[in-house]
Structures are given as structure tokens and as C-alpha cells.
Amino acid sequence: MITTRTARQCGQADYGWLQARYTFSFGHYFDPKLLGYASLRVLNQEVLAPGAAFQPRTYPKVDILNVILDGEAEYRDSEGNHVQASAGEALLLSTQPGVSYSEHNLSKDKPLTRMQLWLDACPQRENPLIQKLALNMGKQQLIASPEGAMGSLQLRQQVWLHHIVLDKGESANFQLHGPRAYLQSIHVKFHALTHHEEKAALTCGDGAFIRDEANITLVADSPLRALLIDLPV
């Protein structure tokens, strides 16, 4: 089953220095029916104004994945670690109890646009504190997984995350690990098909809950970029 969640249905925020779209309850936006999906707690698209920053804060034990769509960001923690990430890169932070983290748009004249996901982290697992990956913009790519398969970022949870790039008319099929997945459109229009021949059309910024499907096929109606988050638990 595919249930779409359009960009217009998501929570919105505009603070001047920050513009945001929230898939699930976050900050001032609250919907008791949308507190996350399986181990996916947060899925935001945010635009930080030139020079803007998120002040240091602590997090619950989650893995934070930032997919940089445009601009350049710097991340720092209270332990003295820092890293920069630019458009075309994904950065994974394995947050730790008692450690605070900040984010800063390094540009003085260009906004920073990125997708941010929070995934519940298994408390028994200890992964590298910071991991970074270059995105392959020419094809589909596994960018995060439990064991770091195929050079992907290593998560502390049973989640597989795919970055998908297709040209118009191309298609890609994905075998899912369990009964749940979430599909997020980044750019342009495409449709998703299940083996039950159920079909859902998505445009820029739309998402879709996928339930009880063994596989899903994406067909690009125009050049497409999307994320598929495979969430068996």
C-alpha cells in the first residue's frame, strides 16, 4: 500500500533565517498521528540563510543524516570535533549523550539547503562519530546501511537508505527488507508502482508511506532525484 503525503500537507516554518518543511511533528508543528514512522523520527528539508546557524544543542540517541542539496555547512560538537560538507555530500553524525552539536551555513551570500533525517540508534552500537560520503549523481546509490555495505555510511539501526537519480523514462526496482519504507521526492515528477499494480504520483517535495510491499518500482516522468528509506523496524 502506498499513502502519499504531499509537500503542501507537511508542517511549514519561516523564521527569516530559516525556512523549513517538516514531514513529522517537529518544533512548533505537532500532529499526534505523525510522530515519526518506525525508526524514522524526523525528516525535514530546511534552508538556512547566508551565515545563519543552529546553536549548540543535545539530541536523543539518534543518527542524524544530512544530505546537502545546495551550499556548504559546518558541523561542530562540544568535544572539539568539526567537519564541513558541501552540495553533493551526505554527512552522518552518531550523536552521543551529553554532547552538543551546532550547524552553520559557511557562505555569507548563499543559502544552505539540505535534507535532515533522525533515526533511532541502537544503544548497544558504537559507530564512528562522524562519517561523510560523496553522492553519485549519475545513478542510484546505497548511502547508509546497518553494516556500511557497498561503501555506505554505517547506521546504528536496521535501516537502508538509497539515493536515487534517474533520467526521464528510466525505472528502478527495489527489494524491501520489511513491511515499511518511506519515499521522499527531492526533484521533479515520478510515479511509484507496487507488485499489486498500485500507482502513486509524486512531485517535488512529496513523500509516500509504503506498507506491506515486498518491492517497489520507481518510474521517472522527468529527470528525478529521490530518497528511499527502507525501515523494517
Task: Locate each region found by the language model.
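Glycine- and acidic-residue-biased ligand/ion/polar-headgroup-sensing regions
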Residues: 60-79, 87-90, 176-197, 204
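Ligand-binding loop in jelly-roll beta-barrel domains
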Residues: 95-125, 211-233
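Conserved hydrophobic/aromatic beta-strand scaffold that supports enzyme active sites
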Residues: 45, 64, 90-92, 114-116, ...
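Conserved short histidine dyad/triad with adjacent acidic residue
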Residues: 4-14, 21-31, 39-59, 69-76, ...
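Short acidic-glycine-tyrosine-enriched beta hairpin
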Residues: 79-94, 135-138, 194-216
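Conserved, well-structured core segments that form or line functional sites
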Residues: 110-194, 200-204
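Contiguous mid-protein beta-loop-alpha structural module that forms a pocket-lining wall or clamp
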Residues: 63-119
